[in-house]
Swiss-Prot record:
This is Photosystem I assembly protein Ycf4. One of its GO terms (cellular component) is chloroplast thylakoid membrane. The lineage of its organism: Eukaryota, Sar, Stramenopiles, Ochrophyta, Bacillariophyta. InterPro entries: PSI_Ycf4_assembly. It is a multi-pass membrane protein. The keyword Chloroplast applies. Pfam families: Ycf4 (PF02392). Seems to be required for the assembly of the photosystem I complex. It is found in: Plastid, Chloroplast thylakoid membrane. Disulfide bonds: none annotated. Its main location: plastid. The chain crosses the membrane at residues 19-39, 62-82. Keywords: Chloroplast, Membrane, Photosynthesis, Plastid, Thylakoid, Transmembrane, Transmembrane helix. It comes from the Eukaryota.
Length: 181
């Protein structure tokens, strides 16, 4: 029974890089916002520098704008971390002849995203590797109606050998062919 069902966990937004950027943007945003407020009230709110000498218009105003923008992005990133957006699992069930792709979305009607496909509708397991400025290395579920469903999460590119090994194992498990996209 255990050999007939395979479940791969997907890490969502709770990755080190998201924690790093949320913290970095929060601290930077607070610094910029406090610098702008300091220039307006002529009171030094930052202990490590004197920002009271900044002219409020335009420097202080721009600093406040960038600070507020940075704080907004950091709060959004923190919310995606708290809600664990994008996490879930892929389940491959040879007993029921199904592939289930389950992910967490944003709160609301579609908080839990469930995609179910019959193995009879699956044509192959596909690998897509693109190099360059924004490299991607992904495994796809290729359906007979020409749709490609991504199975790997958005992340830093993994080693090509690891990706190929994972795709090969999955193709062998599902008794499907492997193709390059």
């Amino acid at each position: 029974m255990q050999n007939e069902i395979r479940q791969d966990k997907i890490i969502g937004s709770r990755r080190f890089s998201n924690y790093f950027w949320a913290f970095f943007l929060l601290v930077g945003g607070l610094g910029f916002l406090l610098a702008g407020i300091s220039s307006y009230f002529k009171v030094n709110l930052l202990p490590f520098t004197n920002t009271t000498e900044l002219v409020f218009i335009p420097q202080g105003l721009v600093m406040m704008f960038y600070g507020a923008l940075s704080l907004g992005i950091s709060i959004y990133t923190l919310l995606t971390i708290i809600l664990d957006i994008g996490s879930g699992y892929n389940e491959y069930n040879r007993i029921e002849n199904l592939v289930k792709v389950v992910r967490k979305g944003f709160p609301g009607k579609n908080r839990e995203i469930l995609l179910t496909y019959s193995l009879s509708n699956v044509r192959a397991i596909g690998i897509k590797i693109t190099e360059g400025l924004n490299p991607t290395r992904s495994i796809y579920l290729c359906l007979k109606d020409e749709r490609n469903i991504p199975l790997t999460p958005v992340q830093e590119p993994t080693a090509i050998s690891n990706l190929e090994e994972e795709a090969t194992d999955l193709a062998k498990f599902l008794d499907l062919r492997l193709e390059n996209l």
